[in-house]
Amino acid sequence: MHQMNIEKRIITRRDFIKISAAWLTWSISFFPMRLGGLSRSTPSAGLLDALSGARLSPQAGVDLPPGQQGRVLVNNVSIYDRPSEFGEKVNAYWFDSILPISQVTASPETESHNPIWYRVGSEGYVHSGSVQPVRTILQQPNSEIPAGGILAEVTVPFTDARWSPGKEQQVAYRFYYETTYWVIQLVYDESNTPWYSVLDDKWELVFYVPATHMRLIPAEELAPLSPAVPPGSKKLEVNLREQILVAYEMDEPVYMARVATGARFSTGNYSTPPGWHMTFHKRPSRHMARGNLAANGYDLPGVPWNSYITESGIAIHGTYWHNNFGRPRSHGCINLTPKAAKWVYRWTMPVVPPDQQSAYENYGTLVEIREE
């Protein structure tokens, strides 16, 4: 009888968060989690059963579809003969190297917040935190661009944006996979190669990107998610201790993602502020830079799917400069994978019309940031 009561006990909020974090430890990057039918009132045994099928086996791993690649995010990264820092180093790659990724696996020998490793072809293993999952998907150039422009995303590991159309022209920025930009025109260089004109939303400059490297995003792909759910019945919860985000509809969890929130640095405390907030301001793309063009600091064009929760600029947004979620590391913002950030962007209020670059209202979806 005692055992039956334990198995059927109703989970608390803390239980739910712990179980969620445990599952998400195994599911980074390739396995988004939607939680239809589960709630805080789900018996814990049932919830564990529901999650167990998606866990990775540390021994077997999971094979990935052909064409999966990874971009190195740090100055140099080591390849090991097994998924562990205690393995033998067999190779090393530099920043922006593109690796063939054939499998994802979890290692019991790796730090607990992110034990995910990628198999690099038949060569060895690399830790996922230093590698962005990417693909190379070339696009057909499209001349049907609305007068006000259209949102687009990069569909190759990286592409160089130039000051003028032409592969010999000076590079202005390097744009990365799944970053987003506002395209205003299709043009051709002297060799008749198509380029998109991209309007920079911070400096109000125009850059040029090979049209085969960007996908114009159709309006239906930006349509709101769960539109039948009353806006007041949606809520986001960010748990700073467990570093996860949970979306609720009618108090039932429907989506989860690992995050990386604000951290303490030698230059100051940038912790994400706990309390109640609201997604009152949203932008599908934002060039984030600290200071002016000559200042030292971060300069990140095309940050995708921004849902702002404070007037000071703290936002929930996609991240392409790291893949190491589950530990604080930002300057206050709530970092997600681009796919997870896009889900949040589409699910929350206010709705940004497809032909507009932002929405700023006095209402939005509630966001509770909890310390535990």
Task: Give residue spans per PLM region.
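SH3/SH3-like (including bacterial SH3b) beta-barrel domains
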Residues: 83-95, 165-177
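Boundary regions of SH3-family modules and the immediately adjacent low-complexity/disordered segments
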Residues: 42-63, 118-152, 199-231
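N-terminal secretory signal peptides
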Residues: 1-15, 19-30, 37-41
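Cell wall/extracellular polymer interaction/catalysis modules
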Residues: 188-195, 199-274
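Exported/periplasmic cell-wall-interacting domains
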Residues: 229-231, 255, 267-274, 281, ...
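SH3/SH3-like beta-barrel superfamily modules
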Residues: 45, 90-132, 176-212
